[in-house]
């Protein structure tokens, strides 16, 4: 059984990267002078999460869709990398794969929202872009980000619940063995003493 910190590492990294990427998206809107910088940073973090060789922001969605369909057909297909890949390659518990796949589906929706935000800005609709990015109404970018984080939490919860259960069962098994172990130790000591008694008598 993997230690809890090892098994949860891709999930913890994915969450941290996700929040950083979401912040880059907001900065992209609010700091026109550095939009190119924040766009590059957002793409770099996206690649850390779900890596697609040679992808740009313009091609990322198609690459994600194509590689994900390939994975659904063959779980050994290696067309993408990143934290999602690490988690999907380390499925251990019942229900974990379905939950992990749900995180990719919600992530894909969030990525499509990002492209909509950039398209609105390019069309001169800055107010609409800001509203779509910052609002929490159903169907907006933040709402989809929340759904993505909830899906990620579900995977984490599955891992935590099973690991906690395994640790508890292990401790229970050890506790059950302790009385037997103590009894066997006392018996061994008694037998040893009995075996030495005749030899000690020789020196009297």
Name each region found by the language model.
Residues 146-170:
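Juxtamembrane amphipathic/hinge helix adjacent to a transmembrane helix
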Residues 1, 182-204:
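Juxtamembrane interface at the cytosolic side of transmembrane helices
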Residues 31, 120-123, 127, 158-161, ...:
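Soluble, cytosolic/nucleoplasmic coiled-coil alpha-helices used as oligomeric scaffolds and tethers
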Residues 81-149, 167:
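Polar/charged, Q/E/K-enriched amphipathic alpha-helical segments with strong coiled-coil propensity
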Residues 3-102, 128-129, 133:
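Membrane-proximal N-terminal soluble sensing/regulatory segments of transmembrane proteins
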Residues 169-187:
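N-terminal membrane-entry
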Residues 18, 22-25, 107, 111-114, ...:
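Sec/Tat-exported extracytoplasmic proteins
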């Amino acid at each position: 059984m993997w230690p809890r910190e090892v098994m949860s590492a891709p999930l913890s990294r994915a969450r941290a990267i996700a929040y950083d990427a979401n912040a880059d998206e907001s900065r992209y809107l609010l700091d026109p002078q550095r939009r190119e910088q924040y766009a590059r940073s957002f793409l770099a973090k996206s690649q850390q999460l779900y890596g697609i060789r040679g992808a740009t922001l313009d091609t990322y969605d198609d690459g994600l869709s194509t590689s994900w369909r390939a994975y659904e057909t063959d779980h050994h297909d290696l067309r993408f990398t990143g934290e999602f890949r690490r988690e999907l390659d380390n499925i251990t518990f019942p229900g974990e794969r379905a939950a992990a796949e749900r995180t990719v589906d919600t992530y894909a929706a969030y990525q499509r929202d990002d492209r909509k935000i950039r398209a609105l800005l390019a069309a001169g609709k800055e107010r609409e872009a800001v509203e779509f990015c910052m609002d929490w109404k159903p169907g907006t970018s933040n709402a989809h980000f929340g759904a993505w984080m909830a899906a990620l939490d579900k995977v984490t919860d599955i891992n935590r619940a099973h690991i906690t259960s395994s640790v508890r069962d292990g401790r229970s098994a050890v506790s059950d063995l302790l009385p037997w172990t103590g009894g066997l130790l006392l018996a061994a000591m008694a037998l040893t003493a009995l075996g030495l008694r005749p030899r000690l008598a020789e020196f009297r």
